[in-house]
Amino acid sequence: LRERVIAAGQELFHKRGIRAVTMDDVSHQLHISKRTLYQLFDTKESLLLACQQKAMAEHQQQIEHIMAETDNVIEIILSDLQLSMMEIQKFSKEFLNEIPLYDKLRENMLHHRKENKANALEFINRGISQGLFRPEINAEMVYEVGVAIIDTLVEKGLYKTVPLFEL
């Protein structure tokens, strides 16, 4: 039941935004009582965190699958970018704009980015050793620029106007 609640929460939050969705909406969607829902998640924010953690875990699984199929760093990075953009396109503008308003969501996302930074730097350094990137590049700066590009695409809503194959 917990997984069904998380899936319903993801669908509603992504489609309508965080503020527009109530715990009542989630319970109605699943045809369960609010009491049952609150036994699983004591607050809307705890449900939001569970939804976010599930999405991050699924993304990580997909990246690990891609990494198992290829050693080419460029393919992995482009696949990750394409996967991220496809995921972001599922979100309403309201949802994306409201994420920063929730401290725990924002903190969780920053923590996730910090964890992934080490992996990203490893990919960049592997690309250097594979001869795919110039040896004098600053891996940290490349990572920060990549993050800034994604943030800008999201912030300005450009992810909806730029075809994926052009990214």
Question: Where would I find each of the regions flagged by the language model?
Answer:
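Amphipathic, non-transmembrane alpha-helical scaffold segments
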Residues: 2, 6, 48, 52, ...
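Helix-turn-helix
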Residues: 4, 8, 12-46, 50
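An amphipathic alpha-helix signature
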Residues: 6, 78, 117-125, 139-143, ...
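Amphipathic alpha-helical interface segments
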Residues: 8, 12, 36, 83, ...
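Short coil/turn segments at alpha/beta junctions that flank glycine-rich nucleotide-binding fingerprints
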Residues: 15-19, 70, 130
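Hydrophobic alpha-helical connector segments
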Residues: 50, 54, 61-90, 143-146
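Short secondary-structure transition hinges
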Residues: 83-122, 129-132, 140-141
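Hydrophobic/aromatic-rich alpha-helical bundle segments in the mid-to-C-terminal region
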Residues: 96-99, 129-167
